[in-house]
């Protein structure tokens, strides 16, 4: 379940630190969060889709690692990001 181009551009515009920024942890976490949300909605309907459930767990793990990296690098950016995304922590 890939993100469409318009959604991706809007996320990039909101979370990018500079023009053309696609690799900063903030952007990566925001994109992963959107994919996780979409997959969660899919799994509410298709409860027995175990293949997608495994993909969801991999995405959550990748997001957790990026958040841990950001917390070690710059705690202020980390706190700002989780506040903007509405993540628990």
UniProtKB/Swiss-Prot annotation:
Q: State the Pfam families in the record.
A: Ribosomal_S15 (PF00312)
Q: Tell me the InterPro entries matching this sequence.
A: Ribosomal_uS15 (IPR000589), Ribosomal_uS15_bac-type (IPR005290), uS15_NS1_RNA-bd_sf (IPR009068)
Q: Does the UniProt entry include the keyword RNA-binding?
A: yes
Which superkingdom is the protein from?
Bacteria
Q: Does the keyword rRNA-binding apply?
A: yes
Keyword field: Ribonucleoprotein, Ribosomal protein, RNA-binding, rRNA-binding
What are the BP-aspect GO terms? translation
A single GO cellular-component term from the record reads: cytosolic small ribosomal subunit
| Molecular function via GO | rRNA binding; structural constituent of ribosome
CDD domains in the cross-refs: Ribosomal_S15p_S13e (cd00353)
Job description of the protein: One of the primary rRNA binding proteins, it binds directly to 16S rRNA where it helps nucleate assembly of the platform of the 30S subunit by binding and bridging several RNA helices of the 16S rRNA. Forms an intersubunit bridge (bridge B4) with the 23S rRNA of the 50S subunit in the ribosome.
**Family statement drawn from the similarity comment of this UniProt entry:** Belongs to the universal ribosomal protein uS15 family.
State whether it acts alone or in a complex, and with which partners, per the record. Part of the 30S ribosomal subunit. Forms a bridge to the 50S subunit in the 70S ribosome, contacting the 23S rRNA.
- What PANTHER family does its record include? RIBOSOMAL PROTEIN S15, BACTERIAL AND ORGANELLAR, SMALL RIBOSOMAL SUBUNIT PROTEIN US15M
Report the NCBIfam families cross-referenced here.
Answer: S15_bact
From the Swiss-Prot or TrEMBL record, give the protein name.
Small ribosomal subunit protein uS15
Q: Which organism is it from?
A: Acidothermus cellulolyticus (strain ATCC 43068 / DSM 8971 / 11B)
Lineage start: Bacteria, Bacillati, Actinomycetota, Actinomycetes, Acidothermales
């Amino acid at each position: 379940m890939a993100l469409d181009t318009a959604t991706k551009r809007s996320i990039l515009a909101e979370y990018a630190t500079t023009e053309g920024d696609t690799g900063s942890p903030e952007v990566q976490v925001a994109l992963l969060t959107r994919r996780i949300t979409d997959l969660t909605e899919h799994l509410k309907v298709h409860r027995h889709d175990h293949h997608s459930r495994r993909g969801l767990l991999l995405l959550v793990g990748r997001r957790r690692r990026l958040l841990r990296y950001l917390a070690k690098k710059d705690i202020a950016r980390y706190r700002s990001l989780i506040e903007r995304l509405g993540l628990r922590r």
